[in-house]
Swiss-Prot record:
Pathway in which this enzyme or protein is active: Secondary metabolite biosynthesis
GO MF assignments: FAD binding; monooxygenase activity
Cofactor(s) for this UniProt protein: FAD
InterPro entries: FAD-bd (IPR002938), FAD-dep_Monooxygenase_BioMet (IPR050493), FAD/NAD-bd_sf (IPR036188)
Name of the gene encoding the protein in the UniProt record: dmxR9
Protein name per the record: FAD-dependent monooxygenase dmxR9
Enzyme class: oxidoreductase
Gene3D superfamilies: FAD/NAD(P)-binding domain
Function: FAD-dependent monooxygenase; part of the gene cluster that mediates the biosynthesis of the dimeric xanthones cryptosporioptides. The pathway begins with the synthesis of atrochrysone thioester by the polyketide synthase dmx-nrPKS. The atrochrysone carboxyl ACP thioesterase dmxR1 then breaks the thioester bond and releases the atrochrysone carboxylic acid from dmx-nrPKS. Atrochrysone carboxylic acid is decarboxylated by the decarboxylase dmxR15, and oxidized by the anthrone oxygenase dmxR16 to yield emodin. Emodin is then reduced to emodin hydroquinone by the oxidoreductase dmxR7.
Family per similarity comment: Belongs to the paxM FAD-dependent monooxygenase family.
Database matches in Pfam families: FAD_binding_3
Enzyme Commission identifier(s): 1.-.-.-
Domain of life the protein comes from: Eukaryota
Alphabetical UniProt keywords: FAD, Flavoprotein, Monooxygenase, Oxidoreductase
Length: 517
């Protein structure tokens, strides 16, 4: 990592997380896809009985790595982890991961300790763009006392440093004895139902097969062609985001920045302006900001290439008058070559995430994209991984794996759909702010982290609902999910419908039935 930038789109050392670097001397990697429990210096979870299900993971992002870990713990054979990049890519900066996604870490002592040591328990505050204070400092709603008492897993701070969280997953994968195969780009997926296999064709012409192929390779995964026949088209939100992270000491060289934040150790502030907002994060060693304006130029692309000049961001910022001078000063402290410009694009959610025979299954962004400002993309990808591994365990054998993937799909689709709709609620909250309502009751400005999301345990839910889902798919028995807002009558929706409501001046939050709090 370059000293002046954090989380840039450059492949790291592909050998850093080779198993031999993380295992005690004299231990070796097994070749049958079961990893190893021969390490002396790690604390591994108890592994469930082997199922004999061979799983090939395509994509070594957070969803793919959690799939690897949980599939190993649930007794499945990991026959490969394929990644298109030439090494681990530490793109990204500060992320929100909600408790539902990491309750499973109670089974992974090393990762639980790592997360608790490395996360940032920043206070959260809300400001008007002029500098007028709105609300805070406070905690995210998922850390209110009423929710902490019964929580399984680690304490979850408001902010995770993406690179640190991702390295935690890479370390744990290496400790199991698995090696990510880099430079392996999937160009097409297939399945042979008669043979009971799914497969992937790589750019090199190599073919790999398994009982279950997990497409965790992100946006525009070629698994879409097998499953849906086409890539899901995008629709612009009319917004984009500029994001960056760099050492705190660089920001503190500016006098105006020092005056505002020098005495602040750990804070996450949201500054709300007309049609735009900026999130500002400070830890003891990192500063990060994400500025979300109207995308007036349409020049942003879905790429983590840090190719934006800070002065261009300042120009966008100052399209709205009366910003507190500290914000423009902070933006100018970003080093050149450290700012990513990303469009906020929506994709309608498809109901089907598996191939017809169930041997190829999608998770994370390949199944359901979330815009980077949603605070939910990583959470739902990790929930996917936990759910899929548990469903395969309950399937119990390779011959039952295709039905297990379809049960996973059934358990996840409606919940993810509702989570995506919450992204619109939070977007309107920050860009179409009801100031009369906020000044009358400032707590209403808080980012929405609903109980039905953060109090969920995807592993327990899969255990509880698998049998009912099985009966529904096999025999047509009634089935109802319970992992979305209580009292909500689920109806599939489209981005076009939501935008029609927004353009009619309606608040998405006001149109929601049931308890979305």
């Amino acid at each position: 990592m370059a000293p002046s930038t954090i989380g840039t789109n450059v492949a790291g050392d592909k050998y850093e997380y080779d198993p031999e670097n993380w295992m005690a001397k004299g231990t070796s990697t097994l070749n049958n896809g079961n990893g190893t429990k021969g390490t002396l210096d790690v604390d591994l979870p108890e592994r469930h009985p082997e199922t004999g299900i061979n799983v090939l993971v395509v994509g070594a992002g957070m969803g793919g790595l959690m799939t690897t870990l949980e599939c190993w713990r649930k007794g499945h054979n990991i026959v490969g982890i394929l990644e298109r990049n030439d090494g681990p890519v530490y793109s990204g900066d500060i992320i929100v991961i909600q408790p539902s996604a990491v309750s499973v870490l109670r089974h992974w002592p090393d990762m639980m300790r790592d997360m608790e040591d490395e996360q940032v328990n920043a206070a959260v505050s809300y400001e008007q763009h002029t500098g007028r204070h709105i609300y805070g400092p406070t905690v995210p709603s998922f850390n209110e006392l009423e929710h902490l008492a019964s929580r399984k897993g680690p304490f979850v701070a408001p902010a995770q440093i993406r690179e640190k969280f991702y390295r935690m997953l890479l370390r744990q994968v290496a400790k199991l004895g698995f090696k990510v195969q880099y430079g392996k780009r999937a160009v097409s997926y297939f399945e042979d139902i008669a043979a009971g296999k799914g497969g992937v064709v790589l750019e090199s012409g190599e073919i790999q097969v398994a009982d279950v192929v997990v497409a965790a390779d992100g946006l525009r995964s070629t698994s879409e062609i097998l499953i849906a026949g086409e890539h899901t088209p995008t629709k612009s939100s009319g917004m984009s985001i500029y994001r960056t992270a760099y050492p705190r000491e660089m920001a503190m060289k500016d006098e105006t920045v020092r005056k505002r934040w020098a005495d602040t150790k750990e804070i996450w502030e949201y500054w709300l302006g007309p049609g735009m907002y900026i999130g500002v994060f400070f830890s003891e060693d990192v500063v990060s900001w994400g500025f979300t304006p109207r995308d007036t130029h349409g020049g942003a692309t879905e790429s983590w290439e840090p190719d934006t000049d800070p002065e261009d961001v300042v120009k966008e910022l100052l399209r709205v008058p009366d910003w507190d001078p500290a914000i423009a000063a902070l933006v100018r402290t970003a080093p050149k070559g450290a700012i990513v410009h990303w469009p906020l694009l929506w994709r309608n959610l498809r109901r089907e995430w598996t191939s017809s025979g169930g041997h190829v299954v999608q998770l994370g962004d390949s199944a359901h994209s979330f815009v980077p400002t949603s605070g939910n993309g990583a959470t739902q990808a990790l929930e996917d991984a936990i759910t899929l591994a548990t469903c395969l365990q309950l399937g119990g054998a390779a011959r039952n794996a295709p039905l297990a993937t379809k049960i996973y799909n059934l358990l996840r689709y409606e919940r993810v759909s509702c989570a995506q709709k919450m992204s619109f609620v939070n977007s309107q909250l920050k860009t179409e702010t009801d100031w009369d309502g906020i000044w009358a009751d400032p707590i209403k400005v808080r980012t929405r982290f609903p109980k039905w999301i953060h109090n969920h345990d995807p592993e327990d839910y899969a255990y509880a609902k698998y049998g009912q889902a099985f009966a529904h798919l096999v025999a047509g028995a009634d089935f109802a999910n319970e992992n979305f807002p209580p009292g909500h009558h689920f109806v599939p929706w489209s981005i076009e419908e939501v935008y029609a409501d927004i353009e009619a001046g309606k608040k998405v939050e006001a149109l929601l039935d049931g308890d979305w709090s």
